[in-house]
Amino acid sequence: NGTGKSTILSNIVDSFYEMAQKHFMNATTPMESGGHNFFKTILPDEIHSGTSYMYSFLLYNCKESPDEEPPIYLCKSGNVTINDIKEQNNINISSISGDVQGNEKVLKASSKQVETIWKENVICYFGPDRYEQPVWLGDSYYIALDYLHPKVEDRFNGRLENSIAVHNVTNLNLQWLLDVIADSRGDIIGESDSLSLAHVSTANLLLMRQARENLEKILSIIIGKDVYFHLNFRSLYGSRFHIVQRENDDIICPTLDSLSTGQIALFNMFATIIHYADNNDITKSILLNEITGIVVIDEIELHLHSKLQKEVLPKLIAMFPKIQFIITSHSPLFLLGMRETLGEDAFDVYEMPKGQKINVECFSEFLRAYNYIKQTQKFNSDIQELARTIPTEGKPLI
């Protein structure tokens, strides 16, 4: 805590908002005096003691517009100029320059470039304040809208459909799940004691079914049981949406928000990635390995017990090989699980505040957790039991 992990992420997310507002009119909130409110304000108080300035510089690698200079984000404060920053970091980019000290924020990207980036990628942020309303919480203590019907909203050019920061999306994802389930079901007609599909292409129906199965696979990994989504009859009391075990058709959960806090948080996180990709291109919900983008997650282990951290999270991340995940974590179990599932070369670990690249077992939280375990009675009794098995005569086997 306090080493700057969230500060780094806040600059990345701020660049998302600054980039998005170049094209989308609803990406940021307007100011009465003109311009827009910053997602991240520039606070000189954040300058470290003993230094006179701070800055953040981000250069994106943009395959969507190879003929244009990639998007550039720079935020600075204190006794430093843009030209100073360029010189310190050997940055040879002509589109940004300046000799003025003090607070300044710059984002270089064209409207067309931004439109293409958001159209072809998932860009989102799951902050530490992400929250899912518990099923037991009274409505008067939590303001939320219920969207439990197939989506009928229009899309408007110039408006951002996928919110950058993701908060309490259970109902929104449930509405979308109803759309996915509806698309995966065909009209059935009876003819001469037989049933057949009508008004739909079998090939298209199978593709839509795959989108549904991708979401069912995510939930199956989280729950640890093979489950599917079931729609109850409209005449029956209670939720129409059930989570059912495939093996015996037993209802595991009567509705999505009956999952545990950790389970629903995980499902919403990865379902939202598919939801956003689906909004851009419906085929992306079918082919998860083709979803591209950047997903930023602060404190990914939030609400998750040890098994979800070590075994489940890495499996879910592995389902999206073309997504760049930028994650902060205090959990050594999560990193061990990532190494076991994806291999050492599939991800990089940087320890703050110096930004040093380290291997998993050099992570300070791992060493600290190990030291805590050594102090337990269970650890000491296991060591003593092991010591009793060592022969007292002859050469020890090393």
Regions found by a protein language model. Give the residues of each.
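Sequence-level motif detector for i,i+2 pairs with an aromatic at +2
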Residues: 120-123, 238, 393
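Switch/communication elements of ASCE P-loop NTPase nucleotide-binding domains
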Residues: 1-33, 236-385
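Conserved helicase/translocase motor-coupling segment
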Residues: 387, 391-398
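The start of beta-strands in P-loop NTPase/AAA+ ATPase cores
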Residues: 122, 293-294, 396
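Short glycine/proline-rich turn/loop motifs
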Residues: 177-202, 246-253, 294
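P-loop NTPase switch/coupling surface
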Residues: 1-188, 204-213, 217-228, 232, ...
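Accessory N-terminal region flanking or inserted into the helicase ATPase core
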Residues: 198-218, 223, 238-258
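Short secondary-structure boundary/capping segments
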Residues: 114-115, 286, 388-389
